[in-house]
A protein has these predicted regions:
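Short, cationic-aromatic polyanion-contact patches
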Residues: 65-87
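Short acidic, hydrophobic short linear motifs in intrinsically disordered regions
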Residues: 25-36
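Short amphipathic alpha-helical interaction segments
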Residues: 41-56
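Residues at alpha-helix boundaries and the short loops/turns that link adjacent helices
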Residues: 22-26, 67
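Contiguous, well-ordered alpha-helical segments that form the cores/surfaces of helical PPI scaffolds
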Residues: 14-18, 34, 52-54
Length: 136
């Protein structure tokens, strides 16, 4: 369906690493997807296929914070980026940086809502709600 050469896959991995390296904090899957799709850096299917491969290669890592999966670049990913960043065309570097600068508030203002409902005695319930809105 989508033919992608080895050189294209390398470039697309570098673009993902470059994106991580220029974010002010770690991001969720949906935040990263938003950035990649809005900048037209690659097609959705290639991006979805590369993410697990990059986790497996330990270029990026995924961890949980407040029951939310977050992604970040690893030391190995940074080292690869330092050596090969010059392979990313200036057009993509500028487009990603411009998007991050101009949409920083949109990217990081997402709300994380978690709730849990527990039954208590006498048909009463205990509800726990966590609302976390990232801010500058």
């Amino acid at each position: 369906m989508f033919e992608t050469s080895a050189d294209d896959l390398i470039l697309e991995k570098l673009i993902i690493l470059y994106t991580f390296n220029n974010l002010r904090e770690d991001v969720t899957d949906s935040q990263l997807t938003q950035i990649i799709m809005e900048t037209d850096a690659m097609n959705y299917f290639t991006f979805r296929a590369l993410l697990p491969k990059m986790l497996e290669s330990k270029f990026i890592t995924k961890y949980q914070s407040l029951d939310t999966d977050l992604y970040s670049i690893t030391q190995s990913g940074l080292e690869v980026l330092v050596y090969f960043q010059n392979r990313i065309p200036e057009y993509f570097r500028n487009k990603i940086l411009d998007y991050i600068v101009n949409h920083d508030e949109d990217i990081f203002s997402s709300k994380i809502v978690r709730q849990a409902k527990y039954s208590s005695q006498d048909d009463k319930y205990v509800v726990t709600l966590i609302l976390n809105q990232n801010s500058r």
